[in-house]
């Protein structure tokens, strides 16, 4: 009985330490989602927009950014300010890093919004 317990523990360890393929399932799952989002560009009336349901004067901008690849969208919108914020965070090393980063983002958002007026695909 001790041999069975030991072999069961070894089998459990092997299962726990086995690496799962990270890129293949995510890529295959993301491809159909992107295809579906490109086919249907209208948003149902019961779905709130990213701006909290507020209507903006330029309705074409959200549609343009939805067709831009995720990496390009993030690189052109939030990565620059996040890199600056993380640099300041590493330099200052405050006691409350999340609050520090949140305050940095709120304090500097207008400067980065002015720099990113053009959507990613229109440069």
From Swiss-Prot:
It comes from the Eukaryota. It is found in: Nucleus. Residues 38-73 have a biased composition (Polar residues). The keyword Nucleus applies. Residues 1-73 are annotated as: Disordered. One of its GO terms (cellular component) is nucleus. CDD domains: DD_DPY30_SDC1. The keyword Transmembrane does not apply. Residues 18-35 have a biased composition (Low complexity). Disruption phenotype: RNAi-mediated knockdown suppresses the growth delay and elevated body fat index of the TOR complex 2 mutant rict-1. Results in disruption of the invariant transdifferentiation of the Y rectal cell to the PDA motor neuron. Its main location: nucleus. Keywords: Nucleus. It holds the Pfam family Dpy-30. Belongs to the dpy-30 family. Component of the SET2 complex (also known as the SET1/COMPASS complex), which contains at least set-2, swd-2.1, cfp-1, rbbp-5, wdr-5.1, dpy-30 and ash-2. Within the complex, interacts with cfp-1 and wdr-5.1. Interacts with jmjd-3.1. This is Dosage compensation protein dpy-30. The gene is dpy-30.
